[in-house]
From Swiss-Prot:
NCBIfam families: pept_deformyl. This is Peptide deformylase. It comes from the Bacteria. Fe cation binds at residues 114, 158, 162. Its cofactor is Fe(2+). Belongs to the polypeptide deformylase family. Signal peptide: none annotated. One of its GO terms (biological process) is co-translational protein modification. Gene3D superfamilies: Peptide deformylase. Binds 1 Fe(2+) ion. The gene is def. It holds the Pfam family Pep_deformylase. It comes from Mycoplasmoides gallisepticum (strain R(low / passage 15 / clone 2)).
Length: 196
């Protein structure tokens, strides 16, 4: 499933738009043309990033995008990336819901970025180390349950935050951006042995 659209940064809604702080509403089935059009844009933008074509289209590369980042405040998002263990992940989740989030914490060692945040914010984004969620995967046309750790867990939480009107930098300690506890897991290439 591939889009024929040519992605552009003009599609993106940025964090200075108050609509990005609104909680997104549930998607109704059957899917409207408006939802299908946003899905097409999601596939175009993230898949061209995945295929290393961001420079070709002069777009900021991204591994995930939520519907509200493209102007529709409804509950769906798309992720497509290869993790540190070279495993490909690709989901377009509609009406996702958390089943479980671990009390153990983790963070991406390199920090996080966002297509809707033009100027990156430095610091560790503290999240749950492991998560489990469910939703309808548009790509497989099935209800799915996903258990995740590592980069996938961080990415899913990042996109779910968007659906709640939150940004990654809301979870950075503004007084001590790089504060961490010894028991928190640093997600980087060293965690690859956990993926096997």
């Amino acid at each position: 499933m591939k889009s024929k659209l040519k992605p552009t940064n003009d599609w993106l809604v940025t964090d200075d738009n108050p609509k990005m702080r609104e909680v997104c509403t549930e998607v109704k089935f059957p899917l409207s043309q408006e939802v299908l059009d946003i899905i097409d844009k999601m596939l175009a933008y993230v898949d061209e990033s995945f295929d290393d074509n961001a420079e070709k289209y002069d777009i900021r590369p991204g591994i995930g995008i939520a519907a509200n980042q493209l102007g529709l405040n409804q509950r769906f998002f798309y992720v497509h990336f290869t993790d540190f263990c070279q495993k490909e992940h690709r989901y377009l989740l509609i009406n996702p819901e958390w089943i479980d989030k671990s009390l153990n914490k983790a963070y991406l060692a390199v920090g996080e970025g966002c297509l809707s945040v033009p100027k990156d914010k430095d610091g560790y984004v503290i999240r749950s180390e492991t998560v489990k969620l469910k939703g309808f995967d548009y790509l497989t046309q099935k209800d799915v349950e996903i258990s995740a750790h590592g980069l996938l867990a961080m990415c899913l939480q990042h996109e779910m935050d968007h659906l709640e009107g939150k940004f990654y930098y809301d979870s950075i300690n503004m007084m001590k951006p790089y504060f961490k506890k010894d028991e928190w897991v640093s997600i980087d290439q060293k965690v690859c042995d956990q993926c096997k």
